[in-house]
Amino acid sequence: MSVIKVSIVSSNEEIFSGEATMVFATGSLGELGIAPGHTPLLTGLAPGPVRVQNNSYEETFFCSGGFIEVQPDIVTILSDTAERADSLDEAAAIKAKEQAEKDLSDKDDNIDYAKAAAQLAEAAARLKTIQKIRKNQ
């Protein structure tokens, strides 16, 4: 069976390096399913889960956004923040979401609304990833 080499890299370290038969990610224009031999592609990566499937395993990661580069036999994901989904902290994600919502509703002129909206989107995507993992267990 044909495989594709996958690398997931955060700003601090390489989170995953291995082979897969399929990779699923949320691109800036929607969901992507990448198989070996995929057409070359470079696109933005939206905050959310990245699933790496192989015959013997499926592993899920959370990426806060970034870029995904696809070549026929290589997928490289570059993300500011990336972590294994099983290490996500639900309580921290809920707290971050609540704080971002509070910041967005605050009428203070010192609030960076674009930053607060991005933090809200990331926290919501993190919670959605946690819920998907629970649902599939």
Language-model segment annotations:
Residues 7-99:
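Compact, glycine-rich, soluble single-domain proteins
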Residues 1-5:
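N-terminal export/targeting signal detector
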Residues 83-137:
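Acidic/glycine-rich phosphate/pyrophosphate-binding loops and surrounding catalytic core
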